[in-house]
Amino acid sequence: MSLTKEFKADVIKQFGASEKNTGKSEVQVALYTRRISDLTGHLQLHPKDKHSRRGLLMLVAKRKKMLNYVKNIDIDRYRKVIAELDLRK
């Protein structure tokens, strides 16, 4: 399932300070998380799809880098994002 405009708007409202703040790190992590979950579901149906698996690994790496950035800037924001997205760190 792709990211719809409505879903993106909801994520921006939830994690961003305003509706126009799409570049905030928390917003980007939330969008990466949704794309990762979509690709994970796709790979469960199509286990031999190696190109999508590579894309999934690249998204996981991007999310990890973004989470490390948030953790280095403000640990409280990091913990809040981890709790809201139910990530394992």
Curated annotation (Swiss-Prot):
Keywords attached to this entry: Ribonucleoprotein, Ribosomal protein, RNA-binding, rRNA-binding
UniProt key word Lipid biosynthesis: no
GO molecular function, one term: structural constituent of ribosome
Superkingdom per UniProt: Bacteria
Biological process (GO), any one: translation
A Pfam family per the record: Ribosomal_S15
Gene3D superfamilies: 6.10.250.3130, S15/NS1, RNA-binding (1.10.287.10)
InterPro entries: Ribosomal_uS15 (IPR000589), Ribosomal_uS15_bac-type (IPR005290), uS15_NS1_RNA-bd_sf (IPR009068)
GO CC terms of this entry: cytosolic small ribosomal subunit
CDD domains: Ribosomal_S15p_S13e
Keyword Ribosomal protein: yes
Family named by the database record: Belongs to the universal ribosomal protein uS15 family.
HAMAP family: Ribosomal_uS15_B (MF_01343_B)
Free-text function comment from the UniProt entry: One of the primary rRNA binding proteins, it binds directly to 16S rRNA where it helps nucleate assembly of the platform of the 30S subunit by binding and bridging several RNA helices of the 16S rRNA.
Assembly notes: Part of the 30S ribosomal subunit. Forms a bridge to the 50S subunit in the 70S ribosome, contacting the 23S rRNA.
Record-linked NCBIfam families: S15_bact
Name of the featured protein: Small ribosomal subunit protein uS15
Organism: Pelodictyon phaeoclathratiforme (strain DSM 5477 / BU-1)
Gene behind the chain: rpsO
